[in-house]
Amino acid sequence: MSSSECSVKPVIANRDDWLSLGQETTPKTWVQWVFIAFAVVFAFWHVATNLLINESALWQNAIHFAGFAVLASVIFPARLFGRQSLAFDLTFGLMVAWAACWVIASESRIYADTLSVTGQSWQFSLWDWFAGGLLIVAAIDFSRRVSGWVIPALIIFSVCYILFLGESLPGVFRTASLPLDDVLFRTIFNDEGLFGILATISSSNITLFMIFGGFLVISGASDFVIELSKVVAGRVRGGAAFVAVLSSALTGTISGSAVANTASTGVITIPLMKSSGFRGRFAAGVEAAASTGGQLMPPIMGAGAFVMASYTSIPYSTIVAVSVIPALLYFLSVAFVVRIEAVKHRVGEGIDMTVSRTKIIAGALTFVIPLSVMIYFLMSGVTPSFAASAAIAVLILVSWIAWLIGQWTGTEDLQTNVMNLKRIIDACLLGMRGGILTAVLMVSIGVINNAIVTSGIGNGFSLMIAQWSQGSLVIAILLIGLASLVLGMGLPVTAAYIILAILCAPALAGILSDTIIIEKLIHGLTDPAQAAMFMLVDSPHAAKVMVGMTLEEAASLLSSMPFEVAMTARPMLIEAETLMGFLLAAPLLFLWLSQDTNVT
């Protein structure tokens, strides 16, 4: 083996450093420099596309997937027969990028050719079939590379389900089969397909927040949250574990990823917890549990907030606002367990956690100010992409202001995290690295989403839950929780949420709203405007709407309402204050449980 081959092999064996300028002693090859340049340009393309360029969703989403296909092909090698091949990975990634561009160029021609002939079949050329098939294969392969075999298996089953398998299944799972050309068209071009609404969420919102998170990390956000957590919680009983919980909560505001959260805070907090007296397994468990909470922590929420906003048409700012209490409840519950463990094993009151005041100030400038700017814009109703872009610009500006202040006062801590060109490039690369998994999964799940919507199995699944629960909210939640548990064993949080939202949300929303409405009917709490809706129902119990009725009468009245009337009545009968009451009840219970006198 030649010396040149020996020098290249270690670089290819660990390709994570391909998306970082870093401090490597091994010089980068020209291929790596081209790859880095492409990733940086691709990051700026996302900013420009969402702020300056107005193109169709198909165009934007296809280019989005094409670029991340190239990045994923290199960072996540195929490992054919246990070996890596850079040539194969790059070739496959470039072929997928070509296929995505071919779809963009062929869309108008496909529509025109189909309209010019009689019949219902889509007019695909041989290259159309090849490009479409390659995109589906890419969705299967890239999702396998980044998350394992569960999602690829679901994609394969979804395609087979609407192609031929659905007509042979019994009950609510039975559906008519579709011809191959129809399956290909719906998978590629439909709003629920590969380049549909889920891909739009990824290309328009999530990727920009990933880039913003990269800027925060490079500017020293991880160090800041650790230092701040030490100041706030470091000197109480079990303080090291509370530092882990608080730092993970703060890091969750910018990462939304359990893996990234653990990697950035766990290397510090786990040794800290072990040295203060916690068992090693417990320390690792606290860090894992606290880091997982990043999926619940606004404003990013592991892409969940963007998916909710798109599916429900509720403003993103509203979803973020109402998510604060459940997120705090989650971290409060983890802290509650930490408190019990600290008392049980007599962990000390804390350890020496001396921090530098200037480090706290420097971190606050580049963490709190940009994050506050982003939250302000989100609450103002602007698009999430604009809010993230504005926060990036403010972060760069603030870092230079801090550097100037440091130069003037001679404070070294204020000068260390200035966002110069090298740091900006590294921030873009880190954002692109973090965005690979989300982008690949959001696009790939479009195949599953298309099969669910096309076949109508979502309605059948919701009907099945409603029948099994017999209108009981508790049973319905247990069934959905069981489904969530099973999906969570093999799917990332965002993927599991999307599938559950499509399959189970209609049933849960219907049972919850019916429970609240029946309660109001029993006690006669409907106002005249709401009561007028029930006067449209041909039922002997309609006259009792204002005065109250029995449980059986209320259930009979509600079940006799036509579907269209029920859909109109539900939003009128359920006030926001009622839902907020449900949200506030659980935290009060946990606050009560957190008192030592109530658990000992």
In which residue ranges do the predicted regions lie?
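Membrane-water interface regions at transmembrane-helix termini and the short interhelical loops
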Residues: 49-53, 75-84, 133-149, 310-317, ...
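Membrane-interfacial loop-to-helix junctions in multi-pass transporters
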Residues: 126-130, 192-205, 231-245, 276-282, ...
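Core transmembrane alpha-helical segments of multi-pass membrane transporters/permeases
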Residues: 141, 146, 156-158, 165, ...
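Long, contiguous bundles of hydrophobic transmembrane helices that form the permeation core
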Residues: 2-35, 321-434
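Hydrophobic packing positions in regular secondary-structure scaffolds
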Residues: 509, 514-600
